């Protein structure tokens, strides 16, 4: 039987690397795997499933945070608050479709004034006087 033998440095254990760092992700792959197993979504969970799910969740979070950061910058703020997340999600067509049924606490409502309630434009009378001068 061939064993490893007494190699130099055999006593030193190799530093453990997380599955998140192996996949190049910030979201915790191990925690997501644990939740998938405990949630009884299926009898067994493949090795790639939690990695893929972590990557998808990380991408969605980055997308929402980028748009919310832009909304905060537009409002001359340095801190993202729920209002900025609401504006970011509702102004993006795909995120609105994904999170359409979700309520964001303290998000407020989207600014909207019906066209019928807006004041009439006065520029139309000026155009008619210019036409009279040309004739």
Swiss-Prot record:
Primary site of residence: nucleus
Molecular function per GO: DNA binding; protein heterodimerization activity; structural constituent of chromatin
Coiled coil: none
SMART domains registered for this protein in UniProt: H2A
PROSITE patterns (UniProt xref): HISTONE_H2A
Location relative to the cell: Nucleus; Chromosome
Any one GO CC term of the record: nucleus
Keyword DNA-binding (UniProt): yes
Expression (tissue specificity): Expressed preferentially in meristematic tissues of young seedlings, in stigma and ovary but not in pollen.
Keywords: Chromosome, DNA-binding, Nucleosome core, Nucleus
Any one of the GO BP annotations: heterochromatin formation
Keyword Nucleus: yes
Highest rank taxon of the organism: Eukaryota
Pfam families per UniProt: Histone, Histone_H2A_C
Family of the protein in this entry: Belongs to the histone H2A family.
Subunit record text: The nucleosome is a histone octamer containing two molecules each of H2A, H2B, H3 and H4 assembled in one H3-H4 heterotetramer and two H2A-H2B heterodimers. The octamer wraps approximately 147 bp of DNA.
Function in brief: Core component of nucleosome. Nucleosomes wrap and compact DNA into chromatin, limiting DNA accessibility to the cellular machineries which require DNA as a template. Histones thereby play a central role in transcription regulation, DNA repair, DNA replication and chromosomal stability. DNA accessibility is regulated via a complex set of post-translational modifications of histones, also called histone code, and nucleosome remodeling.
Name used for this protein in its record: Histone H2A.4
């Amino acid at each position: 039987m061939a064993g490893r033998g007494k190699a130099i440095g055999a006593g030193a254990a190799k530093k453990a690397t997380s599955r998140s760092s192996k996949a190049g992700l910030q979201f915790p792959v191990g925690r997501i795997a644990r939740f998938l197993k405990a949630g009884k979504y299926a009898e067994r969970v493949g090795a790639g499933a939690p990695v893929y799910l972590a990557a998808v969740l990380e991408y969605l979070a980055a997308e929402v945070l980028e748009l919310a950061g832009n909304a905060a910058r537009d409002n001359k703020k340095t801190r993202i608050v729920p209002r900025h997340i609401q504006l970011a999600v509702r102004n993006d067509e795909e995120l609105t479709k994904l999170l359409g049924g979700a309520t964001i606490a303290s998000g407020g409502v989207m600014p909207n004034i019906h066209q019928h309630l807006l004041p009439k434009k006065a520029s139309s009378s000026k155009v008619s006087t210019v036409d009279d001068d040309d004739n």
